[in-house]
């Protein structure tokens, strides 16, 4: 069994806040909701997140494509990205 000793009287080094680098934004369809956006805004303000990753950008609830040979609709996708950028987040694609 390995053991480690910690001297609590010794001063330590500042910890790098690696958690501020990125937050997972869950599924893209959730980011269309006002309550989700408010929670994300608070999280960015309080925690200082810089990057956001999420999944489901082309999921059915984003309505990018829903008919064979039909047009593409990026309105919801653009709405999400515009909101992320307004918060100072860099969305990862």
What are the roles of these predicted feature ranges?
Residues 1-93:
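Non-catalytic accessory regions flanking glycosidase/transglycosidase catalytic cores in CAZymes
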């Amino acid at each position: 069994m390995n053991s480690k000793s910690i001297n609590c009287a010794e001063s330590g080094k500042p910890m790098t806040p690696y958690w501020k680098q990125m937050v997972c934004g869950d599924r893209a369809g959730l980011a269309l909701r006002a309550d989700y956006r408010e929670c994300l805004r608070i999280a960015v303000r309080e925690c200082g997140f810089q990057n956001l990753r999420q999944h489901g950008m082309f999921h059915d609830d984003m309505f990018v494509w829903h008919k064979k040979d039909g047009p593409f609709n990026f309105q919801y996708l653009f709405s999400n990205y515009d909101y992320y950028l307004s918060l100072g987040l860099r969305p990862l694609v």
